[in-house]
């Protein structure tokens, strides 16, 4: 299944800029060359039309990507080992903040090193690494060093693998298209054995070490990981059933293991994180599911599922040929494959964002509010990018890989044939959502300005309670006992029902109340998401042709206009739809992050007195303030931004500078988005004239950015 030595390793070849393209390799005539070089370097489709060669390049590039990821991880662990207060934080996580970066005293920058507690001065980090390290049982900086070195070794291995599997032993196309085998290995190997080994690590290393840490034992006194693995008596002291070894497993007396494989639900009141015994149980269960799933598909033996059969059998009474032909699409178009994967992974990433705060998985994560906010923001943004990427690659598939002559009356063909109905209805839904959701706010602003609070939509006047959401919350809060035997509490405290959990005088989590304010902003979310989908879906469904430009497929994925003499055909390419979709994705996620930040500070996060009185960070003002646009501007945007803007001269000044810098970058983007190409070309011509006059003109002709290039630079900034 492999070819030996298919491509020779040549440093001379790599050193030649643009070696992958005949035109670019000729060298620059104009400055457009450098843009084309960057645009096409990784567009393997443009290098060759041979699917096997493209597949090999993608496969090899994945190893390069993994190498970079290991390098990054190594850097994170190295910072933890070399520059951090991890051991101090471990001994007192409620009073000491995590820091892994100390700024050198150059031109006064050491002002950034704030006091994070315990006499350590540095920048407080919000990545959540300390919490993960504690959960995985890392007790010393030496262990972090070892892990960092291990990650570097793996980075080197991955780099080697990328070279080896392209230049020395490159898989044949048949190997890339053997989906059943791939599914079996990925499910059973990566997900199954991966989860099983993690569950094993948690049971044998994380659980005992965290038991000791929770009990207040000094990290230096705790036995090292290998001692727990080699010495069963150590574990048996904490979990007596360990003394029996594997006997209960083989005699099916599994309840013996209930000490360390639990099903409690809720949070550990000591750390404010999920019970680590629940997490270990979860990974064991997941491992078993995936190990079974990894044996479902038919390979060398004549048993199991065949993907092609499953897809072709999948048709309903109203859907024509159903999924017939989908198998061929997904095994010959990597763009189509990638599109599906991005859509699913993007959605999953957003689900992760919501679980990180509602079911905080690591010890002391819930009371580290900055980290909670950062993790939510990070996962929302990544999810948004992946979903827009899904639309981008779906459109590239439509333009480059879709063959309309062989597709008839399957689901994709049927969707394309009634795309006008889909898009016009979706457009109507967007208009409806936009006017109504915004209209509710405008109504409230107007009534507020007229001094008529009794006529506003609010929890104290005209109520618009999110009754369905409240019903879902209530159902989950009542679920333990009714549905899940043995579970003492519901999956998340946010559903309601339980008492709040406080750790070190700070609220970890409490039932999150939903009211009129949430109902209003929820419909803004619905509006922005639907508009994003409208733009992206229109780009995909009209990527090959439209009434305006019937031959769009011939123009490619990105083009500025349909040539001279065709007015009104600019910015219609599939690429332009991705460009516009990105802006709406930014829009949508901004509102989500605003909602989350304010809601959590107002109704969840805060301190708790000895008498049990909770004081929230913004004093519970979300319900009454966020129901007007003015409230959002005054009590959220200005109230929070003013603290950042006034941070100059304090250890927080970096955030003020970032805030300022981010707005500069944003303003800079407008220069590219509102620019006329001809204006710049004209300006360049006169600058070139001046250079010629002084006989210092370069051989490479300067060119203004093309329309598409300008928009690319703009949207990036």
UniProtKB/Swiss-Prot annotation:
Gene3D superfamilies: Photosystem I PsaA/PsaB. It comes from the Eukaryota. It is found in: Plastid, Chloroplast thylakoid membrane. It is an enzyme of class 1 (oxidoreductase). It is a multi-pass membrane protein. Its EC number is 1.97.1.12. The chain crosses the membrane at residues 58-81, 144-167, 183-207, 279-297, 334-357, 373-399, 421-443, 519-537, 577-598, 652-674, 712-717. [4Fe-4S] cluster binds at residues 561, 570. Its main location: plastid. P700 is a chlorophyll a/chlorophyll a' dimer, A0 is one or more chlorophyll a, A1 is one or both phylloquinones and FX is a shared 4Fe-4S iron-sulfur center. It catalyses: reduced [plastocyanin] + hnu + oxidized [2Fe-2S]-[ferredoxin] = oxidized [plastocyanin] + reduced [2Fe-2S]-[ferredoxin]. GO terms for biological process: photosynthesis. Chlorophyll a' binds at residue 663. Keywords: 4Fe-4S, Chlorophyll, Chloroplast, Chromophore, Electron transport, Iron, Iron-sulfur, Magnesium, Membrane, Metal-binding, Oxidoreductase, Photosynthesis, Photosystem I, Plastid, Thylakoid, Transmembrane, Transmembrane helix, Transport. One of its GO terms (molecular function) is 4 iron, 4 sulfur cluster binding. PsaA and PsaB bind P700, the primary electron donor of photosystem I (PSI), as well as the electron acceptors A0, A1 and FX. PSI is a plastocyanin-ferredoxin oxidoreductase, converting photonic excitation into a charge separation, which transfers an electron from the donor P700 chlorophyll pair to the spectroscopically characterized acceptors A0, A1, FX, FA and FB in turn. Oxidized P700 is reduced on the lumenal side of the thylakoid membrane by plastocyanin. Belongs to the PsaA/PsaB family. This is Photosystem I P700 chlorophyll a apoprotein A1. It comes from Drimys winteri (Winter's bark). The gene is psaA.
């Amino acid at each position: 299944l492999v070819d030996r030595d298919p491509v020779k390793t040549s440093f001379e070849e790599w050193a030649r800029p643009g070696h992958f393209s005949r035109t670019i390799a000729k060298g620059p005539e104009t400055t457009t060359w450098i843009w084309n070089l960057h645009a096409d370097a990784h567009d393997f489709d443009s290098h060759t039309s041979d699917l096997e060669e493209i597949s090999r390049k993608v496969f090899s590039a994945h190893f390069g990507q993994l190498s970079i990821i290991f390098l990054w991880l190594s850097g994170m662990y190295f910072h933890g080992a070399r520059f951090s207060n991890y051991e101090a934080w471990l001994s007192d996580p409620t009073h000491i903040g995590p820091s892994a970066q100390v700024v050198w005293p150059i031109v006064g920058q050491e002002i950034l090193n704030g006091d994070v507690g315990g006499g350590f001065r540095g920048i407080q980090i919000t990545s959540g690494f300390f919490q993960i390290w504690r959960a995985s049982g890392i007790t010393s900086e030496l262990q972090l060093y070892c892990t960092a070195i291990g990650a570097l070794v793996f980075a080197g291995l991955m780099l080697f693998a990328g070279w080896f599997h392209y230049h020395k032993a490159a898989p044949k196309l048949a190997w890339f298209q053997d989906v059943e085998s791939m599914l079996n290995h990925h499910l059973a190997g990566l997900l199954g054995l991966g989860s099983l080994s993690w569950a094993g690590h948690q049971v044998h290393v994380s659980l005992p070490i965290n038991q000791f840490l929770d009990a207040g034992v000094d990290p230096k006194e705790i036995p090292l990981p290998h001692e727990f693995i080699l010495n069963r008596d150590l574990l048996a002291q904490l979990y007596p059933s360990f003394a029996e070894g594997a006997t209960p497993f083989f005699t099916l007396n599994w309840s013996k293991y209930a000490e360390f494989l639990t099903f409690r639900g809720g949070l550990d009141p000591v750390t404010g994180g999920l019970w680590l015994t629940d997490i270990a149980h979860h990974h064991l269960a997941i491992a078993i599911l995936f190990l079974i799933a990894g044996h479902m598909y038919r390979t060398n033996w004549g048993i199991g599922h065949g993907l092609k059969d499953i897809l072709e059998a999948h048709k309903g009474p109203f859907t024509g040929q159903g999924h017939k032909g989908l198998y061929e699409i997904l095994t010959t178009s990597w763009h189509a494959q990638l599109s599906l994967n991005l859509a699913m992974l993007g959605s999953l990433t957003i689900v992760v964002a919501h679980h990180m705060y509602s079911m905080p998985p690591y010890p002391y994560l819930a009371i580290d509010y900055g980290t909670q906010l950062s993790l939510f923001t990070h996962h929302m943004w990544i999810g948004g990018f992946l979903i827009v990427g899904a639309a981008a690659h779906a459109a590239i598939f439509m333009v480059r890989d879709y063959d309309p002559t062989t597709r008839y009356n399957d689901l994709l063909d049927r969707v394309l044939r009634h795309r006008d109905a889909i898009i016009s209805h979706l457009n109507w839904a967007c208009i409806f959502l936009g006017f109504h959701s915004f209209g509710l706010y405008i109504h409230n602003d107007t009534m507020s300005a007229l001094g008529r609070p009794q006529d506003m939509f609010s929890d104290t006047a005209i109520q618009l309670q999110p009754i369905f959401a409240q019903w879902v919350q209530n159902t989950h809060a009542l679920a333990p006992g009714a549905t899940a035997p043995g579970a003492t509490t519901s999956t998340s405290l946010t559903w309601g029902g339980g008492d709040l959990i406080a750790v070190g005088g700070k609220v970890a989590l409490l039932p999150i109340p939903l009211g009129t304010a949430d109902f209003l902003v929820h419909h803004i979310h619905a509006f922005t998401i639907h508009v994003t989908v409208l733009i992206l879906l229109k780009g995909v469904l009209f990527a090959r042709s439209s009434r305006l430009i019937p031959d769009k497929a011939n123009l490619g994925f990105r083009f500025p206009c349909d040539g001279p003499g065709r007015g009104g055909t600019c910015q219609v390419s599939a690429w332009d739809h991705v460009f516009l979709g990105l802006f709406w994705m930014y829009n949508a996620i901004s509102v989500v992050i605003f909602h989350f930040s304010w809601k959590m500070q107002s109704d969840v996060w805060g301190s708790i007195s000895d008498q049990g009185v909770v004081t929230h960070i913004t004093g519970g003002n979300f319900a009454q303030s966020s129901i007007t646009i003015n409230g959002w501007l005054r009590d959220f945007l200005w109230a929070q931004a003013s603290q950042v803007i006034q941070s100059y001269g304090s250890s927080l000044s970096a955030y003020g500078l970032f805030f300022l810098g981010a707005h500069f970058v944003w303003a800079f983007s407008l220069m590219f988005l509102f620019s006329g190409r001809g204006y710049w070309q004209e300006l360049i011509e006169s600058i070139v004239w001046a250079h010629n006059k002084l006989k210092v003109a370069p051989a490479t002709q300067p060119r203004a950015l093309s329309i598409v290039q300008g928009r690319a630079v703009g949207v990036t900034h």
